[in-house]
């Protein structure tokens, strides 16, 4: 049995393990493994924390984006309403302006028409007075003619004006 190499390998292995146990290599290996385990645990905790922070930041970004989108829609709606109000106000002002200008033009036309009628009547009265004067002066002579002429002229003027 001592002549077999496997036996010597087993004895050497047991002696080596005994020396390692005596020197305390197992404690060094275990403490190194414990440190590595703690470092990996810390890295995993950091990764979880970073993941949670990223999720919070993403949720915050999405909320701010939605808020900005709503605010933009509100601004657009308010701008449309303001534009419609301004357009309606401008239309009302334009209609009021056109109505006032039309009324003013109609007033000027009526005034011009009344003035034209008055001018025509005055011209007709002057023509009638001239015709009456001519007829009376040709047919009647003297003081009677002058009295009739003044009376006729005043009657014609009062009736035509």
UniProtKB/Swiss-Prot annotation:
CDD domains: ATP-synt_Fo_b. InterPro entries: ATP_synth_b/b'su_bac/chlpt, ATP_synthase_B_chain. GO terms for molecular function: proton-transporting ATP synthase activity, rotational mechanism; proton-transporting ATPase activity, rotational mechanism. Its main location: membrane. One of its GO terms (cellular component) is plasma membrane. It holds the Pfam family ATP-synt_B. The chain crosses the membrane at residues 5-25. F(1)F(0) ATP synthase produces ATP from ADP in the presence of a proton or sodium gradient. F-type ATPases consist of two structural domains, F(1) containing the extramembraneous catalytic core and F(0) containing the membrane proton channel, linked together by a central stalk and a peripheral stalk. During catalysis, ATP synthesis in the catalytic domain of F(1) is coupled via a rotary mechanism of the central stalk subunits to proton translocation. PANTHER family: ATP SYNTHASE SUBUNIT B, ATP SYNTHASE SUBUNIT B', CHLOROPLASTIC. Belongs to the ATPase B chain family. This is ATP synthase subunit b 1. It comes from Nitrobacter winogradskyi (strain ATCC 25391 / DSM 10237 / CIP 104748 / NCIMB 11846 / Nb-255). The lineage of its organism: Bacteria, Pseudomonadati, Pseudomonadota, Alphaproteobacteria, Hyphomicrobiales. The gene is atpF1.
């Amino acid at each position: 049995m001592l002549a077999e190499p496997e036996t010597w390998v087993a004895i050497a292995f047991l002696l080596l393990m005994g020396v390692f146990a005596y020197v305390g290599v197992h404690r060094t290996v275990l403490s190194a493994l414990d440190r590595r385990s703690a470092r990996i645990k810390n890295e995993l905790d950091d990764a979880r924390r970073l993941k949670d922070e990223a999720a919070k930041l993403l949720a915050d970004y999405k909320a701010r984006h939605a808020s900005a989108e709503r605010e933009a829609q509100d601004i657009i709606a308010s701008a449309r309403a303001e534009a419609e109000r301004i357009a309606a106000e401008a239309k009302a002002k334009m209609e009021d302006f056109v109505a006032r200008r039309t009324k003013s033009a109609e007033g000027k036309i009526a005034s011009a028409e009344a003035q034209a009628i008055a001018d025509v009547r005055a011209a007709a009265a002057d023509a009638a007075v001239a015709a009456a004067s001519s007829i009376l002066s040709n047919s009647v002579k003297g003081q009677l003619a002058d009295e009739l002429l003044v009376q006729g002229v005043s009657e014609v003027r009062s009736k035509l004006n």
